Amino acid sequence: MGKLESSPDVYRFSEHYLPWHAHITAVTVAPEARRLGIGRLLTEQLEVAADAGDAWFVDLFVRVTNHKAITFYKNMGYSVFRVVKDYYGEHSTDPSQSSEDAYDMRKPMKRDVKREHVREDGEKHEVDPSDVW
């Protein structure tokens, strides 16, 4: 599941402003249907829609421990843009629960000729969940 979106214009001058882009909300393939190219096909279709909609990039969030997904997306041209500390977990409602960081991964689309919305050293850029909206 994915969508095209941007941050509200009122935040245009914020360092966390997100211009027009596509966002992968979830890609889920049944275990018995994995490794058949279905996830790649679904992701590529969102990328086609992103280019057709003149988006700057496609982004997604993935747990830093989900090595299979990270490898999958890197093989498709995505890179880590930033690390979102404590993105996953029940720590906000139950402090006794542990949390987990997320990678915000991005792939530039045709519009981003200068690659302004991706970076090579994203693992070094950490933000809090409150910086991601």
Segment roles from a protein language model:
Residues 59-61, 74, 79-104:
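Conserved catalytic-core motifs of GNAT/GCN5-like acyltransferases
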Residues 43, 66-69, 85-92:
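Short glycine/proline-centered loop/turn elements that form peptide/ligand docking sites
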Residues 1-34, 40-54, 83, 106-116, ...:
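Acetyl-CoA-dependent GNAT
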Residues 28, 64-66:
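Active-site-proximal loop/turn and secondary-structure-junction residues that shape catalytic pockets
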Residues 97-101, 112, 121:
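Charge-rich, low-complexity terminal tails
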Residues 35, 69-70:
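Internal amphipathic alpha-helical segments of the cytochrome P450 catalytic fold
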Residues 50-62, 72:
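Conserved GNAT acetyl-CoA-binding A-motif
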